Amino acid sequence: MKVDVLTSGYVSMDHIIKIATPAKVGFTSLVTNKSNSKIFYGGCSVNIAYALCRLGMKAMPVLRVGGDYESNGFKKFLEEGNVPQDGITQIAEEATSVCYLLQDNNNDHITIFYPGAMDGRYAQKMKDSLFETAKLG
């Protein structure tokens, strides 16, 4: 498949969690947003590819996902955005990367990230064919 742009980088199933008070060891902070379990599909390379595809270009992300790729809705999200999935490798025994973004009422942030399938131990040589068919990447 010919593509205009290849993007590379981690994918992330983002969860935005707003808390009433700053996080502190030994104390409980109440979550204030009921959307805290909603997944926001992201990662810079995914966001760029998705936006370019929505603008009519063919942009393909090169990344790894876990065995939960379909059940977490990420595959459907990409399909709905017409994002090519030929550059996606699935690591069945692993989870897709997850990020928990904690924001307190002072707008201070804590980011907690689980690399999952994007962990370096799963890295492998990319196929030359991915680059041979891309105009930019």
Where are these regions (language model features)?
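Conserved N-terminal subdomain of the carbohydrate kinase-like
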Residues: 28-36, 54-136
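Glycine-rich phosphate/adenosyl-contacting loop at the front of the ribokinase-like
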Residues: 1-64, 71-73
